[in-house]
A protein has these predicted regions:
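Sec-dependent N-terminal signal peptides of Gram-positive bacterial secreted proteins and lipoproteins
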Residues: 2-25
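Active-site-proximal helix/loop microenvironment
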Residues: 159, 175-178
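Residues within alpha-helical transmembrane segments of multi-pass membrane proteins, especially transporters
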Residues: 13, 153-156
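N-terminal propeptides/leader regions of secreted preproproteins
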Residues: 21-128
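Alpha-helical hydrophobic membrane-insertion segments
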Residues: 5, 22, 133-136, 168-171, ...
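Hydrophobic alpha-helical transmembrane segments
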Residues: 158-168
Length: 214
């Protein structure tokens, strides 16, 4: 069931990223003057992120989140497969299902009856994020790794990258805290589900509403 769910979720990512929902997000997503972080959609599936003097492009494909540093012209990726995320940055793989199987959603089927929105919370340790993002990552790479981990956990979150960036940029010293790599502390992410029409099927998707440290 888990393998079926993961395959279904990954196969929908491109479809979801090229529907009017994301097209409507074209333009500035947020501009946080306090943290000097801003981002905007430059194509249906590509996001431009400015973090201080760093400029990055995040691209979401069917089962991959790619981060390109436009200053150094280096490209890295997070590959999602069967509840796992592999990082080209570190060469490491994080198994989301190893301890978080209770967080797997049931998004492997369309919604056939009256729908009631749900709220879920999931925890991600700093150790997992650092294992994927590396020891000197900026907010763009950290956000991309979080989005990949949520996808591997079964949360279908179209357009989640700006939400994640906005929330983590508001946490003082977040990147430095992540780089410490604690396995006992991390982030608690709250997601709220909603229904969405995808080519005639009503699907359950998720919006990231809150990220706090624990």
């Amino acid at each position: 069931m888990v393998k079926k769910s993961m395959a279904f979720i990954m196969s929908l990512l491109i479809v979801l990223c090229t529907t009017p929902f994301v097209n409507a997000n074209t333009g500035t997503e947020f501009d946080d003057s306090k943290s000097d972080v801003s981002c905007e959609w430059i194509q249906d599936d590509e996001l431009l992120v400015k973090d201080g003097t760093d400029l990055s492009r995040i691209k979401i494909d069917e089962n991959m989140v790619t981060v390109t540093n436009l200053k150094t012209e280096t490209e890295e990726y997070f590959y999602i497969s069967e509840g796992k995320v592999h990082s080209s940055i570190t060469g490491e793989t994080v198994n989301v299902l190893e301890r978080d199987s209770s967080e797997i959603t049931n998004s492997d089927s369309t919604i056939k009856k009256a729908y009631k929105s749900k709220t879920r919370t999931t925890k991600i340790t700093y150790a997992k994020i650092k294992k994927l993002a590396g020891g000197s990552a900026g907010l763009a790479t950290i956000a991309a790794s979080i989005v990949a981990l949520l996808g591997a956990a079964g949360f279908l979150c179209p357009g989640a990258t700006p939400q994640v960036l906005s929330l983590i940029s508001g946490i003082a010293g977040f990147a430095s805290t992540v780089m410490k790599g604690s396995s006992k502390h991390g982030i608690k992410t709250t997601l709220k589900s909603y229904k969405r029409n995808v080519k005639g099927d009503i699907m359950e998707c998720w919006k990231v509403t809150k990220i706090v440290k624990y």
